Amino acid sequence: NAGWYTFLKDINYPYGVKDMPISEDRLKWFLSVKGAIMLGDEDTDPNDGSLRNDKGAKEQGNNRFQRGIRYFERNVLIADSLDMPFRWRLQVVKKAAHENSKMIQAAAPFLLEDL
């Protein structure tokens, strides 16, 4: 679970893409590539020592779970506004906090499905 995201919004990097020369074609490519946001449903500790908690990160949500949901939902809205398919998945891993071992077990089928 990422601690914060670079949103496709007009806010400064690293939390947004303000003043970056991103064409509509490049944006469509980014949103059409197969991808996944995988979140542990228990990754909700706002005081986790490895969680970024500056103003920009906190504006995305109080914890990794909230931030991931908001990032995914925002990208769905952008794809809809561009009238294009969105190929990302949102997968919530039950009973997982910020734990690599539980996340990789859930990620393996997605990562290997095209082999």
Residue locations for each model-derived region?
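C-terminal catalytic histidine-bearing segment of alpha/beta-hydrolase fold enzymes
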Residues: 49-52, 69-115
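The feature captures the conserved acid-bearing segment of alpha/beta-hydrolase catalytic domains
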Residues: 1-77
